[in-house]
C-alpha cells in the first residue's frame, strides 16, 4: 500500500485527462493506496468535487473500470489560480507534512517559478516535498538554466523529478536491464562500431502546429528522448545505480559539435507542413532531422551515433540498433518488450528475453511510481539537461546560419537509404 499525497496542477488539462489520472489508476490497481492517501486535483476553473469527477469520468471512463470507484474516492478538487496567493494558503491547510507530498507541474514552464515561490511561502517545501516537472524545460541552454535557477531558490535538486516518458518505456528500460544482467554483452560493448537510435512517426503535427512550429524535431525529440537513450547506451555502468545519473552526465558532456554540418546533419520538412493549422507560411522548422554524432570518450571515440527522428514517414519505428565489429547487431524496440540479436553465423535473429517477467507499468505510471518511491534513476539531472542543450545549441546555430540546407520530402514516401546517404559515407 502506497502512502502519499499528490497535488496535480493543471488537472483539467489535456495531459492530465489523457495520461496522468489513468496512470495513477494503474498504480492503484497494482499497489493500492492507504486510505488517507490523496490526489488533489488542482485547476483554474471553479468546480465542485462532483463537477470535476463528472468531467474526469467523461474523459477517462474510470468509473466503469475494475476498482475505478475505489480509486476515484481518493480524488478531490481544489481551485488554485497560480497567480493567487490566497489559493495557495487554502492548499496549505489541507496538504500534509508527515508523508511524501508530490506536486506535479502539468503547467506551462512560465508558471514554474511563481508556483514554486507560493509553495515555499506556505511552508510546502519541507523534506518530504517532491516536484515533478513536465517538459519543455527550456528552449535552449540559457532558458533551461533560468527555469532551474528560478526553482532552485526554493527546492533542492534531490527534490526535483524531470519527467521524460521515454525513460519509462519498457524498451528503453530493457537497455539498462540487459546490460546489468548479461556480462557477455558487456564484453561486446567494447566492440561497438555504430549505434542507430531512430524514432519515425507516420503522423504529422496534427493539432500541435503552433507549438511544434516553435520547436521542431530537434528540440521536440532529440534534445531529450534520443540523447537520454544515447546516454544509457554509452554510459559506464556504476557499481551503485544511484550513481547512474552522474555517469550519464559525463557521457553527455563529451558530445562533439559537428565538424562538417553537411556530412553530419540532415534536416528536412514534409511537403504540406506549411499548410498545417497555425504553422507559419514561410516556416523553416524541421520535421525530419538526422545527426551523425560522436563522443569524446576512450570507449566510443570515432564510433558514430546516428540520431534520427521524423514525422510523416512511411512507417512507425522506434528502435535502437547497435552494430558490433564482428557484423553482429543488437536491436531494441523502444515501444515494445522485444530485443533481437543478429549474429553473422546464424541465419535467423535470436529473440532475447529480459529477466523481469512482472507486468510492466506503462511509461507515465512507471515514472509516477518511481517518484512516489523517491527513485531518481529514470529522471534526468539538471546537469544532463544542460549538457544536452550545449550540444543542441550548436545544431540550432547551424540551422540558423543555414550550415545545412532545409530539404523537402514527400509525406509517407521518403526513401530513407537515399536521403541519408551523406551521413553513412
Curated annotation (Swiss-Prot):
To which pathway does this protein belong? Carbohydrate degradation; pentose phosphate pathway; D-ribulose 5-phosphate from D-glucose 6-phosphate (oxidative stage): step 1/3
One MF term from GO for this chain? glucose-6-phosphate dehydrogenase activity
Q: Which UniProt keywords apply?
A: Carbohydrate metabolism, Glucose metabolism, NADP, Oxidoreductase
One of the GO BP terms on file: glucose metabolic process
Q: Does the keyword NADP apply?
A: yes
- Binding-site list for NADP(+): 44, 135
Q: Which Pfam families match?
A: G6PD_C (PF02781), G6PD_N (PF00479)
What does the record give as the reaction this protein catalyses? D-glucose 6-phosphate + NADP(+) = 6-phospho-D-glucono-1,5-lactone + NADPH + H(+)
> Which terms in the GO cellular component ontology are assigned?
cytosol
> Catalytic site residues?
225 (proton acceptor)
The UniProt record gives the binding positions of substrate as 165, 169, 201, 220, 311
Database matches in NCBIfam families: PRK05722.2-1
Family (UniProt): Belongs to the glucose-6-phosphate dehydrogenase family.
Q: What does this protein do?
A: Catalyzes the oxidation of glucose 6-phosphate to 6-phosphogluconolactone.
What is the protein named? Glucose-6-phosphate 1-dehydrogenase
Show the taxonomic lineage.
Answer: Bacteria, Pseudomonadati, Campylobacterota, Epsilonproteobacteria, Campylobacterales
Amino acid at each position: 500500500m502506497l502512502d502519499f499525497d499528490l497535488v496535480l496542477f493543471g488537472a483539467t488539462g489535456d495531459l492530465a485527462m489523457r495520461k496522468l489520472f489513468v496512470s495513477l489508476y494503474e498504480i492503484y490497481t497494482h499497489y493500492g493506496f492507504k486510505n488517507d492517501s490523496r490526489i488533489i486535483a488542482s485547476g483554474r476553473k471553479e468546480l465542485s468535487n462532483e463537477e470535476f469527477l463528472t468531467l474526469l469520468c467523461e474523459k477517462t471512463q474510470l468509473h466503469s473500470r475494475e476498482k475505478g470507484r475505489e480509486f476515484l474516492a481518493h480524488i478531490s478538487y481544489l481551485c488554485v489560480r497560480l497567480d493567487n496567493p490566497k489559493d495557495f494558503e487554502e492548499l496549505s491547510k489541507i496538504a500534509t507534512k508527515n508523508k511524501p507530498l508530490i506536486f506535479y507541474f502539468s503547467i506551462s514552464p512560465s508558471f514554474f517559478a511563481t508556483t514554486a515561490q507560493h509553495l515555499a511561502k506556505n511552508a510546502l517545501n519541507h523534506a518530504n516535498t517532491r516536484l515533478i516537472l513536465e517538459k519543455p524545460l527550456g528552449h535552449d541552454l540559457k532558458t533551461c538554466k533560468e527555469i532551474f535557477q528560478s526553482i532552485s531558490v526554493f527546492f533542492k535538486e534531490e527534490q526535483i523529478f524531470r519527467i521524460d516518458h521515454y525513460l519509462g518505456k519498457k524498451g528503453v528500460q530493457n537497455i539498462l536491464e540487459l546490460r546489468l544482467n548479461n556480462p557477455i554483452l558487456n564484453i561486446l560493448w567494447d566492440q561497438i562500431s555504430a549505434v542507430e537510435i531512430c524514432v519515425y512517426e507516420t503522423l504529422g503535427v496534427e493539432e500541435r502546429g503552433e507549438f511544434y512550429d516553435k520547436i521542431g524535431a530537434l528540440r521536440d525529440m532529440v534534445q531529450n528522448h534520443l540523447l537520454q537513450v544515447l546516454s544509457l547506451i554509452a554510459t559506464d555502468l556504476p557499481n551503485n545505480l544511484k550513481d547512474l545519473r552522474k555517469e550519464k552526465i559525463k557521457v553527455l558532456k563529451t558530445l562533439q559539435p559537428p565538424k562538417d554540418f553537411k556530412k553530419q546533419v540532415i534536416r528536412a520538412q514534409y511537403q504540406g507542413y506549411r499548410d498545417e493549422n497555425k504553422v507559419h507560411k514561410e516556416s523553416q522548422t524541421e520535421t525530419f532531422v538526422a545527426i551523425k554524432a560522436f563522443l569524446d570518450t576512450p570507449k566510443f571515440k570515432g564510433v558514430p551515433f546516428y540520431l534520427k527522428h521524423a514525422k510523416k514517414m512511411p512507417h512507425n519505428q522506434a528502435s535502437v540498433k547497435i552494430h558490433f565489429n564482428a557484423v553482429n547487431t543488437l536491436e531494441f524496440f523502444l515501444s515494445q518488450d522485444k530485443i533481437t540479436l543478429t549474429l553473422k553465423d546464424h541465419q535467423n535473429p535470436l529473440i532475447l528475453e529480459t529477466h523481469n517477467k512482472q507486468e510492466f507499468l506503462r511509461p507515465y505510471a512507471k515514472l509516477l511510481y518511481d517518484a512516489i518511491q523517491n527513485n531518481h534513476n529514470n529522471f534526468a539531472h539538471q546537469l544532463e539537461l544542460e549538457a544536452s542543450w550545449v550540444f543542441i545549441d550548436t545544431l540550432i546555430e547551424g540551422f540558423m546560419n543555414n550550415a545545412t540546407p532545409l530539404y523537402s520530402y514527400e509525406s509517407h514516401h521518403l526513401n530513407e537509404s537515399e536521403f541519408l546517404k551523406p551521413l553513412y559515407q
